[in-house]
Amino acid sequence: MAKTYANPLLPTSQFPMCGNCFRADMYKGCAFGCDYCFANNRGGNFERDFQVANVDLIRKWFKEAIEDGDVSNIKKECLNNRVPIHLGGLSDPFQKCEEKYRASYRFLEISKYYKYPVNISTKTAHLDDMYWEILDPKIHTFSLSILGYSDEYVRTWESATPLATERIAFAKELKERGFWVSIRIQPIILMEEVEKLIKASENYVDYYTVEHLKLPVDNADVCKRLLQKMYGVQTQLVAKGREYEFDSVTKRKNIEYIKSITNVKIGCGDNDLHVLSDSLNCCGIDTMPKAFKNWLKYNSMYIKMTGDRTQWSPSANCNSCFNGDCVIKGFTTMSQYVDKAYAAQYGDPNQLTLDLL
């Protein structure tokens, strides 16, 4: 019997800059085993032992928050306000173990019962018929992750995922069934692969989110192994916080080029280039169906792009969203962390232009 995943539903620590951070993960651990996965590669934050969410407990939280009006903690306050959920923030909801446990299926059943909006992130290329019976384009959207187009390139970085052509075919099927669909091109490593992917998929998607490769500063073994695979990449990685990243000039040039080759809206997942996005959230949640309207707008990206600080933000204590060493003494609310992150990112809490500092 699998261990129970104790914390399957909670806003992530990315909420200061992300409006689609109320994540649900039905599994802890992922069989797709992508070499670049931040969840597996960052030290200390993601255990590798397999665990399954207690879906009955999640159902209880939904009932208490939505039917009984319980807003006693951050997750229940978000549920009560129908903040859209991002399913698959750390592990794929449709990996192989779903055939045995059906935790994602049961979670989507809850979503359908409460007509609750869920954005599904996945690398899958197929769903059994039982899923189509509960999925609803009004409340369910899909973000498919694909890093490139050619089989050899994909297999260099991903050993157990469907090929890009299979995932693109799945995107086409989703569009034909009426779903909002995006492709998250992450990580960007070789631009020629990005261009091939866009040309093969742009007729089937509503949005692209793009984000460049990041390597963990605190995991030398992973860095060494992945750097050996980066043949043909003409850029210098620079240290920024906990990660090595592409330099900002290269990232900006890449984004400008991507925008020049497609008419599909682009969202920029790199934290330093959020404002180059074609929408107010890098994953495009503001372009999803109206059921998603209550996304968490009080974040640094939204404020930077609109100047609007009047949007609702949860009042419950949010410190459970962080590891202990990231909690700031005296802070309890999301808005406090957002305001601090905004000032740190842009230098002045009242600076509202779209200039990149």
Name these PLM-found stretches.
Residues 2-143, 149-151, 339, 343, ...:
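Conserved Radical SAM active-site core
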Residues 1-3, 7-16, 26, 33-36, ...:
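Intrinsic structural disorder
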Residues 2-3, 200-357:
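Auxiliary Fe-S-binding modules of radical SAM enzymes
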Residues 68-257:
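Conserved AdoMet/S-adenosylmethionine-binding subsite of the radical SAM
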